[in-house]
Regions:
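Early transmembrane hairpin module of multi-pass membrane proteins
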Residues: 2-233, 245-257, 261-312
Length: 313
């Protein structure tokens, strides 16, 4: 098989999506007619809603960043030797999954910003979930007796169940459960476990989730006082329960922190990309939400390098 087979396949699928998406948009077959009255108004993410090709042109096209970064990952993987024990070096099921999910972050978000439809919002949210659950599941896989098949089955099961549940409810699944937000905590917890694994730390690591909550503005006393809303904090101990083996490798954490800095910077900018913020300029070609897309795309690459950086302990 040509070593660039998967890169070429990903490139073909990406270009095909862009062509079909643009054609359907040009024919006005996928935009929301119910929300047509919003044309000319500032969208939820500040940019003025357009009656043209895409409802939010800048917020739509900025998602090309995800597709380009994901394609570059495929290029890097295609040039690797395939004899590495690291699943993020060379072409294999896990590396293909990661790069593919990064690419899909682009189309998922395009479908929302380009159409302003409920199903587009569902596709966008699903793409985010498909990405964010992957790192912490991979970390658990790396600290357990899971086989690759078990890892993939678990990942696919979560995605399928979530996609159906989310379709019929909302982004909190009707039970005050934001899987995307919780997964950020689970990722940080699993990274702490990977770095400092010990039998005792397996049960301490869950508290790191509260540091993540504090970083995003939720204090521990709020969790205690409103436990019916924050019941999901019990999941912070899931990585420790499942990670029953010390990892065989170490990682270079500078790439993880660069990824986090990029993501948190993007999040800070994301907060300004709303109509009632003083910096909102609906007609500007520089949109805060577009910058959010580009910076988070960069963060996925930093995390990619992070997972590629393992060394034998």
């Amino acid at each position: 098989m040509n070593k660039f087979y998967y890169f070429n396949l990903a490139l073909f699928i990406s270009i095909s999506f862009l062509l079909i998406f643009t054609l359907l948009s040009a024919l006005n077959l996928i935009q929301s007619n119910e929300a047509a009255y919003l044309i000319g108004e500032a969208s939820r993410w500040c940019e003025r809603v357009s009656g043209g090709l895409f409802r939010e042109p800048i917020n739509t096209l900025s998602n090309l960043g995800f597709m380009l970064v994901g394609l570059y990952m495929f290029w890097v993987l295609s040039n690797d030797e395939n004899n590495s024990s690291n699943p993020f070096i060379g072409v294999n099921k896990i590396s293909i999954l990661y790069a593919s999910v990064v690419i899909y972050l682009g189309p998922g978000s395009m479908l929302m910003h380009g159409t302003n439809t409920e199903w587009g919002a569902w596709a966008d949210n699903l793409s985010m979930i498909m990405y964010i659950i992957l790192p912490w599941l991979f970390n658990i896989y790396s600290m357990s007796k899971w086989t690759i098949s078990q890892f993939l089955y678990t990942y696919i099961s979560i995605v399928v169940i979530y996609s159906i549940w989310r379709w019929f409810t909302d982004f909190e699944l009707g039970i005050n459960f934001n899987l995307f937000g919780v997964s950020i905590g689970l990722w940080v917890i699993s990274e702490a476990l990977y770095r400092y694994w010990s039998p005792v730390f397996r049960f301490i690591a869950g508290f790191a989730g509260f540091l993540v909550l504090m970083l995003f503005g939720t204090m521990p006393n709020e969790v205690i006082e409103n436990f019916n809303e924050f019941w999901w904090v019990i999941l912070f101990w899931l990585p420790g329960i499942l990670s029953n083996q010390q990892p065989k490798y170490s990682r270079t954490y500078k790439w993880f922190f660069l990824g986090m800095i990029s993501y948190l910077s993007a999040f800070a900018i994301w907060l300004t990309g709303v109509p009632d913020h003083a910096s909102c300029s609906p007609d500007s070609i520089i949109q805060a939400h577009g910058i959010w897309h580009l910076l988070t795309a960069i963060s996925t690459y930093f995390f990619f390098i992070h997972f590629r950086s393992i060394k034998t302990i």
